[in-house]
Amino acid sequence: MYVADVPARLLAVHAHPDDESLTMAGTLAGAALAGAEVTLVTATLGEEGEVIGDELQGLIAARADQLGGYRLTELAAAGAALGVRERVMLGGLGAFRDSGMAGTPSAEHPRAFIRAQRGGPDHDRAARALAREIDRVRPHVLLTYDEDGGYGHPDHVAVHQVVLAALPLAAWPVPRVLAVIRPRTVTQADFAALTTPPGYLAAAADEVGFLAADDSVAVAVPVTAAAARRRAALAAHATQVELLPGEVFALSNRIAQPLPAAEYFRVLAGSPVPVGPDWTVPADVAAGLDLDR
């Protein structure tokens, strides 16, 4: 899959701990299993997150405000489960803070990552920090979010905008940049087939984000070989994710969601992905790239 004189180098750029596991765990773990070098950049510690269960409620921002430090340990465990070679906090540990949801007081914090959105006071600083990581890692493929961040969270939107700003600042020309998406038809079918466990809430696919047109899919990565690693990574984020029987999970909102059988990406920038002779999309995010450069 990633056979070359030089192993494929993947750089995943995310907003909070758990985003890497919720959106592309199978892709990252599968790449690592195949010999790729996977680096994970995370912008914030997820300080404004809610907490599942009663035991650690004292960590939340409204109380001790220590959730970020705890989630850093969860991120370390998840990264180990996925086989991530290196984890990096964008700009250094604590440089940026979780903004919380749009319109909340936490977005006014002087370190809130919403300030890194295009036109914000920290946009250039964040872009330069990411450009340094791009030049250091020299990724063949950079994986991140689409323009709406998947579901509109201001930190996800900021990540997308920072990635686009960092690309021309870096000396290393990233051959391919991919955005994680969920094709509408497949995702709707997955939700329609889901039996909601007792005590949890049902939702339609349109309510959970990342949906895109089916024909925008450039890569479809089956999760089968990395399914156990995905579950281990999600389990590591225990303050945020609850694994339910079967391939089902829930966040603190207790909405049951299916774990997809594949992870999907569209091309955001760089080299297009070659299709197969029968017009099927490849299962390799580095398909068609020269990995020896």
Curated annotation (Swiss-Prot):
The keyword Zinc applies. GO terms for biological process: mycothiol biosynthetic process. This is 1D-myo-inositol 2-acetamido-2-deoxy-alpha-D-glucopyranoside deacetylase. Belongs to the MshB deacetylase family. Its EC number is 3.5.1.103. Keywords: Hydrolase, Metal-binding, Zinc. Binds 1 zinc ion per subunit. One of its GO terms (molecular function) is N-acetylglucosaminylinositol deacetylase activity. Its cofactor is Zn(2+). It comes from the Bacteria. Catalyzes the deacetylation of 1D-myo-inositol 2-acetamido-2-deoxy-alpha-D-glucopyranoside (GlcNAc-Ins) in the mycothiol biosynthesis pathway. It catalyses: 1D-myo-inositol 2-acetamido-2-deoxy-alpha-D-glucopyranoside + H2O = 1D-myo-inositol 2-amino-2-deoxy-alpha-D-glucopyranoside + acetate. Pfam families: PIG-L. InterPro entries: GlcNAc_PI_deacetylase-related, LmbE-like_dom_sf, Mycothiol_biosynthesis_MshB. Zn(2+) binds at residues 16, 19, 156. The gene is mshB.
